[in-house]
Amino acid sequence: MPPENLRFSKGTEVLIPRVGEDPMDYNHCTWLSMPDVAIGEMISVFNTDNNPLFTATMFNATLQNEFAMRVEGGSVTNLYFEKLKNIEVSFPSIQEQEKIAAYFENLDHLITLHQHKCDELQKLKKFMLQNMFV
């Protein structure tokens, strides 16, 4: 694709997958926190003045069925942004969004730390088992 046809992020976009194999595949929204990242054609971009982390989390938690009802296609489904424009969503205040987003961000960090610890314990177990019967 020629560089002039690329879309670049501002760093606050919510990204919604446009292509999936199943209508329920569309609960993988995320937000792009970095500016100047090229965004592929198979991604719908939702620009918002709301907290993007909160928005992506809310979309994943509450709009999966709404998204699934709007997909088109058979073995490969498509979710076109035009089909999403008439979904009504209410947002709490920005302050509440910030608090909720921070809570989930901290929870994600905690999960990552525990996963890392679990991975290290698995390695230790493997090492101990290998050396136990030498």
Model-derived segments and spans:
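Feature detects amphipathic, helix-rich regulatory segments
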Residues: 1-134
